From Swiss-Prot:
Record's protein name: Cobyric acid synthase
Taxonomy of the source species: Bacteria, Bacillati, Actinomycetota, Actinomycetes, Mycobacteriales
Active site as annotated: C343, H434
Keyword terms of this UniProt record: Cobalamin biosynthesis, Glutamine amidotransferase
Pfam family, one: GATase_3
GO MF annotations, alphabetized: ABC-type vitamin B12 transporter activity; catalytic activity
Entry keyword annotation includes Iron-sulfur: no
Protein function: Catalyzes amidations at positions B, D, E, and G on adenosylcobyrinic A,C-diamide. NH(2) groups are provided by glutamine, and one molecule of ATP is hydrogenolyzed for each amidation.
Encoding gene (name): cobQ
Pathway info: Cofactor biosynthesis; adenosylcobalamin biosynthesis
PROSITE patterns linked: GATASE_COBBQ
Length: 512
């Protein structure tokens, strides 16, 4: 197969959220990049509180940053021009080309759609001019036909740009054949004409047993299944959104300890959690068991409590108090137990939060575990950052409205500018920096300190855990799965020629 023939663009849509769109796009991007193809990812609109900061100080969804890494590219706002960050069940912060614009509800958003449609079209056209291949990711499911009129990321994008569409479904959830058929059937004929085939994700067992079902799916839809991706336990880093963060569930695949003791970490699963991926670096370490927790009783036998970031800091702080987790954290800290707060979680650990921006609550008492006062400002801090923590070079990124107006504790680290960052008081640690735990030497120092405070004298940190290498290995595994299990000739043809002419329309009473 001639590598030079890989040219064009396609859209990966899904039967549901968390069906496998993000990982399939990452796998396709990695597979093409390994073949020397100039490839870029694109998600017109993402709804997620897991985000990263680009080199130019913009903000995009973390999944698109991972997909960029799969392509061998730095994150760019071009790859995710519209980002919605939910702050409540009814409102989201609207981020356009990396910058927060306003807070919108569902009805308010309609007012912005024409402008956003133009932004999306411009960015996609620019990427198609600069790269051989652009792999686009849909949002949620195109089957949400109540949203079709305002759709920017699914069939609205495919129709506007003439993109062939592959629909991926998660067989691990059950009912995948019905999901795939139904996704096509509820669409209008013009949308259906762009649906070129299916991919089944997370299959376990003998794939030949699926054959009769796939034959029937082709018979009733007129479209082939282009591949069946097997379930892979080793793929767990960089969850796209909060759907991957399940309360009272383990993070990753814990490896046995090197020494005699495990280190048990409880990460609080906040209702408006953001950048939950911060704790994944801890779960990469042998002998470190990380679980998401929503029940205060589960904190009684933990060694380290982690309060992650939040898109609604004051609201999530009130949730901690209502369900008893705040009291459990205080009791743990009183016993000398280690606590780590990151970004919004760091702000919660302080004495007071003054918030006239997100919640409008004014001065709100924090948990009081750090001598810290934070005040929210309308403009958001967005920056990639570097510094030094106790002789160890560190890096990360900042995404927050809160400004420290007083810090009476020792700093956790110093930024490269010399400015103090974060706090340490006994075994309570806090920082505004996301991604700090991905610095391997710093993470080992922190875990050694946590083990000492927790009395886990038999815990031994691994000397060679490399989070960046683990992430790279997962991207290569994704590419291997794509290469081994998808019809690459059919994908190449779709990229070059678009959806085949004459695909049948499935009659439906739901659409005209």
């Amino acid at each position: 197969m001639s590598e030079s023939r890989w040219k064009g663009a396609l859209l990966v849509a899904g039967t549901t959220s968390d069906a496998g769109k993000s990982v399939l796009v990452a796998g396709l991007c990695r597979m093409l990049a390994r073949r020397g193809v100039r490839v870029a990812p694109f998600k017109a609109q993402n709804m997620s509180n897991n985000s990263v900061v680009t080199l130019d100080g913009g903000e995009i969804g973390r999944a698109q940053a991972l997909q960029a890494a799969a392509c061998g590219l730095e994150p760019s706002v071009r790859f995710n021009p519209v980002l919605l960050k939910p702050g409540s069940d009814r409102t989201s912060q609207l981020v356009v080309r990396g910058r927060a614009v306003t807070s919108v509800g569902a009805r308010d958003y309609i007012e912005h759609r024409q402008h956003l449609r133009a932004v999306v079209a411009e960015e996609l056209a620019s990427l198609r001019a600069d790269y051989d291949v652009v792999i686009c990711e849909g949002a949620g499911s195109p089957a949400e036909i109540n949203l079709r009129a305002t759709d920017l990321a699914n069939m609205g994008l495919a129709r506007a740009a003439g993109l062939p569409v592959i629909v991926v479904g998660d067989i691990d959830r059950g009912g995948v054949l019905a999901h795939l058929f139904g996704t096509v059937a509820v669409l209008g004929p013009d949308d259906q004409a762009l649906i070129a085939g299916f991919v089944i994700n997370k299959f376990r067992g003998d794939v030949s047993l699926l054959g009769p079902g796939l034959e029937q799916l082709t018979a009733v839809t007129g479209r082939p299944t282009l591949g069946v991706i097997p379930f892979a336990e080793d793929l767990w880093l960089d969850a796209e959104d909060s759907l991957g963060v399940v309360g009272d569930a383990p993070v990753g695949r814990p490896a046995p300890p090197i020494g005699d003791d495990w280190l048990r970490v409880a990460a609080i699963r906040l209702p408006r959690i953001s950048n939950s991926t911060d704790v994944e670096a801890l779960a990469c370490e042998p002998g470190v068991s990380v679980r998401w927790i929503t029940d205060p009783s589960r904190l009684q036998d933990t060694d380290l409590i982690v309060l992650p970031g939040s898109k609604s800091t004051v609201s999530d702080l009130e949730w901690l108090r209502r369900n008893g987790i705040a009291d459990a954290i205080a009791a743990h800290a009183k016993r000398g137990g280690p606590v780590l707060g990151v970004c919004g979680g760091y702000q919660m650990l302080g004495s007071v939060i003054v918030d006239d921006v997100e919640s409008g609550r004014g001065a709100v008492p924090g948990l009081g575990l750090l001598d810290l006062e934070v005040e929210f400002a309308p403009d958001k801090v967005l920056a990639q950052v570097r510094g030094n923590a106790h002789g160890v070079p560190v890096s990360g990124y900042e995404i927050h409205h809160g400004r420290v107006r007083r810090n009476g504790d020792q700093p956790l680290l110093h930024a490269s500018s010399g400015a103090a960052e974060g706090s340490i008081r006994g075994a309570v640690y806090g920082t505004h920096w996301h991604g700090l735990l991905e610095t391997d030497r710093f993470r080992r120092l922190l875990l050694d300190d946590v083990a000492e405070h927790a009395g886990r004298t038999g815990f031994v940190t691994a000397p060679d855990t490399d989070v960046a290498a683990i992430r790279t290995a997962q991207l290569d595994l994704l590419a291997d799965l794509v290469e081994q299990n998808l019809d690459l000739r059919a994908l190449e043809d779709l990229l070059g020629a678009g959806a085949p002419e004459g695909l049948p329309a499935i009659a439906s009473t739901l659409v005209s």
